[in-house]
Amino acid sequence: MSDNQNKPGKPNKPEAKQASKYPVNMTDTSFPMRGDLAKREPQWVKQWQDKKIYEKIREASKGRPKFILHDGPPYANGDIHIGHAVNKILKDMIVKTRQFDGYDAPYVPGWDCHGMPIEIQIEKLYGKSLPTAEVLEKSRAYATEQIERQKKDFIRLGVLGEWDNPYKTMDFGNEADEIRALGTLLEKGYVYRGLKPVNWCFDCGSALAEAEVEYQDKRDPAIDVGFPFAEPEKVAKAFGLAKLPTNKGYAVIWTTTPWTIPANQALNVHPEFTYALVQTERKGETVLLILAADLVEATLQRYGLEGKTIATCVGEALAMIKFKHPFADVDPGYNRLSPIYPGTYVTADSGTGIVHSAPAYGIEDFISCKSHGLKDDEIVAPVMADGKYASWLPLFGGLTIWEASKPICAKLDEVGSLFKLVMFDHSYMHCWRHKTPIIYRATSQWFAGMDVMPKNQGTTLRETALAAIEQTEFFPGWGKARLHGMIANRPDWTLSRQRQWGVPMAFFVHKESGDLHPRTPELLEQIAQRVEKNGIEAWLKLDPKELLGDDADMYLKNKDTLDVWFDSGTTHQTVLRGSHKEQLAFPADLYLEGSDQHRGWFHSSLLTSSMLNGHAPYKALLTHGFVVDGEGKKMSKSKGNVVAPQKVSDSLGADILRLWVAATDYSGELSISDEILKRVTESYRRIRNTLRFLLSNTSDFDAGKDLVAVADMLEIDRYAIAQMNAMQNEIVAHYRAYEFHPVISKLQGYCTEDLGGFYLDILKDRLYTSGVTSHARRSAQSAIWHLTQSLLRLMAPVLSFTAEEAWVIFAGKDAGDTIFTQTYYALPEVADGDALLGKYTLLREVRNDVTKQLEEVRVAGGIGSSLQAEVALQASGDKFAALESLDDDLKFVLITSQASVKKVAGTEEESVLVTPSTYQKCERCWHYRADVGSHAEHEGLCGRCVANLFGKGEARHFA
C-alpha cells in the first residue's frame, strides 16, 4: 500500500481505512511532527544539566585516546553575537564528532578577562578617578557578571562542556602562572626594555597590539615640504658640479602627517635611485630642488613650476649631506640639521622620492636613525600620551597633533617651505575599540625580541615560530601562508601596557640605572605565589620592603601590565598545563577561531609557546570566516541587518542555527538572513519527517527478539544497509577533515532521495500490509532499525537537540542517559554489498524513467495514481538482469500494481509502456489485482491481503 504521489517519507494514512475491519499496520510515535524547538530545547538543556550529562560523557570516555580542542577565549564583555555563535557551534560539532569517533574529547570553555574594554566600562560606570584597588575589584566583578550572561547563551546553543569549571584568565592561579611564564622568558633572554615606536592610542592612553589595529579611511593634508640646503658645497659635489648656480635650494619631501614635521631629524633617499638637481623660478627668485629623477616632471607640474635638470646623481652620493629644519630660522628650538640617510624602503611611486624621518613616530624612521648612531636620549619626541604636544615644543606646544596640522602648514607656507597642500584620502590606522586614529609613538616599553638569540636555544623567536608553522596543519590551507607572512614581517612584540586591569609585569626597576633587580627571577616566583592566593591585587598591595629589605629604597615597582594577548596567548601554559591539566593535554590537537586570529590568538599563542617550548601549542589551526547578511554586507546596528543568535534560538530553535552553520562553507563568509533561515527550516523539517517515519515504524519492534540477521533479510533491505554503510564512511571522513557542509548535503539527499524518494517509499507497502510479525515486515524493521542507529549518531553533532529527542524515544530502555556517550554505529557487514550497490544504482535509474512515464500518463488523465498502472519494460544487458532478478517483486520497486520485463538486444530497443489496470482496487493495500473479490468472506480484499491477515502471509524475497 504505497503511492509515489505521496510526499517522500510520509505514510498515507486515510482515517477511513484505519477504522475499517481490515486495518493496516499503522504504528505511531511520540516523536512529534512539529519540532517546537524554541520551547523544547530549553527543557533538554535543563535535563542535560540536571543529569550532569557532560560529566557522564567524560566518565564513559575514560581510557580512550584524547582529542583536545583548546577554546580560544571570547572577551568577557557584552552579549554574544552571531560570530560567537558560529565559533562555539563549530567547536561543539568538532568535539562531538571526535567523541563519536572513539576519542575522549573534553571541552573546557574559557574567557579573556583583563584589559581595556572592561576598564573603559568601569570608567563609564564610576568615573576616571577611582583608586586602582577599586578599579581591580570592580573589573573583576564586572567580568564575572559578563561571563555568566555569555555562558547562559552559549549553553542554550546546545554546546556541551565544562561550564561549571571554565578557565578564566583572571583566575588567581592563571594570573600567577602568567607571571611565572614572564619570568621564564626573561631568564631565557627574550625580554628587554627599550625605546621604540609602538602603536599608540590616545584614548586608551596605552600601546596597542598589532591585532588591536584596524584600518579606516581618513582625510589628511598631503604636503610637499622643502628642507633648505645647509651644505651647498656638498650638494654641488654630490651632483658633480664645481659650484651651484645658487645656494638657495631644498630637498623636497612629501608626507600625509604634517604633525611629524616638528619632530623631523633626518631625510631618506633610496641609495640606487637617480636624483635630479632641478633649477626653477619660484616667487621671483632662482631656487634649486632635489627630486627623484623619475618624478621631476609630475612634481613640477603639481607645483605649477617650470624648470630644468642641471645635474643628476644616485641616492648614495647624497648620504650624510645635512639640511636645515624648515622652522630653523623661526625658533632656535628647531635649529638642528637633518642628514640624509639612504634607505631601501623609499619608493618612487608617488611624492618626491625623498622621505622625511621622525624617528619617534615611524618604525622605519627609528631603525634608520638608530642604525646611523642616533641615541635614545637624542630622539625628539614631543607628542604626549594624550595626543598633545609637550609644552616645551616651540610654536605648537599644548596643541593636539590633529589640530596642529593647520598651523604647521601655515607656518611652512610663511617660511617658504610649503610647495603644495592637497587634502588626501587614505587608509589609516585606527584603534579597534575607540575607532579613533592612532600613531606610532616612541616610548619606553618592554619587548619580546623576534630576532634575539635566546640562552640555550640555537634559533631566534622568529626562526622558531616559522619552523613551527611548517609543522602545523591548516584548515583551510591558505592560513599557512597568511600566518607565515605575519610572523616573517612583524616587529618585536610590545609586551607592556600602561593600564590597571591586567597582569602586572611585576619587576623592581633600579631608580637610577633602570636595571632590573638582580634577583628578579626569584622575586617573580615569590610574587606569583602571593598572586596565586590573592590575585593581581597582591602586587598592588605589596610593600617592596617585604621582598627587597634594605634594597627597597633603591627600586621602583614597575607599573606596566602585560598585553592581554599575552594573557590568552599563554593559556597553553596556564590552562593546558596548569589549571585544567587533568582534563586537557599539551599540545592541543586544534585551535579554531575566526580568520582575524592569524594576527591575534593563533599568533600570540605561537610566539609564547615558541619561546617557552620551542614549538607551536597546537597541531592544527582551523579558520572560519565572518558572518555577513544575505547580500554579503557586513552586519551593523545602523544598517538594521544584525541577526542575534538569541533571537533565532528563541524563535526557530538552536538546532536551526546549528544546521545553518553546518550547511554553510565556513572557510569563506557565512551569509545569514531571514530568507536563508527559512530555507534551513524547510530542510530541517524534511529531516525531522524522515526521523518521525523511522521512529514510528520501529515503535512496535524489539531488536532483542525481532531482529532479522542481515543474511536473512530481503534484498532491498540488505541494499539499504550497504548504502548506509558507504554513506557513513563518507560522512565520518568529512567529519575527520572538519568538513560539515558536505555532510549536510549528504544527509539531506539521503533523507529526501535515498530514503523518502526510494527506499521508504517502496517499504511502506511491506510495513503497512504484511503480517505484523511476518518475516517480510521484521526484515524491513530490522533494516530501518540499523539505519536509525547510524543516522541519529551521524546527525547528533549538528542537530544535537533533535537527535537526543529522537534517541530517547528510539532506543527506549537502552538509551542510557544520552546519545552523546555513544560512538558511531557499527553497521552489520553485507556480504554482497558492493554488488547490491551497483545493481540498485541501475534499478533506481529505471525507476526514475518509469516515474516520468507514469507522471505523463497521470497528467493526461489515464491514471490517478501509480498503483492504478501496469508497466511493461523492455531492457537489455545488466539492466535486464537487474530487473528480471526481482521477479514478482519488481512491481513493488516501481510502485505499480503489475510490472513485467522483456529482454531486448540493445539499448535502442529499450522502452517503458504504461497502461491503466483493468482490475479492481483492493480496499486495504490499494493495489489493482485480478484476485480482488475472489474470497467470498472478504470481497473487498486481494489474495495477498487475505493471506497476510488470515493465512500464512505472502512470500517476499527482494522488496
Curated annotation (Swiss-Prot):
Where in the cell?
Answer: Cytoplasm
* Signal peptide as annotated in the record: none
The coenzyme or cofactor needed here is: Zn(2+)
- Cysteine pairs bridged by disulfides in the record: none
The Gene Ontology biological process terms listed for this entry are:
isoleucyl-tRNA aminoacylation
Subunit: Monomer.
Protein residues bound to L-isoleucyl-5'-AMP: E593
What top-level class of enzyme does the UniProt entry assign?
A: ligase
| Cofactor, free-text remark | Binds 1 zinc ion per subunit.
Binding positions for ATP per the UniProt entry: K637
For this protein, what is any one GO molecular function term? isoleucine-tRNA ligase activity
Task: For this UniProt record, give its keywords in alphabetical order, as a comma-separated list.
Answer: Aminoacyl-tRNA synthetase, ATP-binding, Cytoplasm, Ligase, Metal-binding, Nucleotide-binding, Protein biosynthesis, Zinc
- Family the UniProt entry places it in: Belongs to the class-I aminoacyl-tRNA synthetase family. IleS type 1 subfamily.
**From the record, which residues define motif 'HIGH' region?**
74-84
A GO cellular component annotation in the UniProt record: cytosol
Recorded protein name is Isoleucine--tRNA ligase
Note on domains (UniProt):
IleRS has two distinct active sites: one for aminoacylation and one for editing. The misactivated valine is translocated from the active site to the editing site, which sterically excludes the correctly activated isoleucine. The single editing site contains two valyl binding pockets, one specific for each substrate (Val-AMP or Val-tRNA(Ile)).
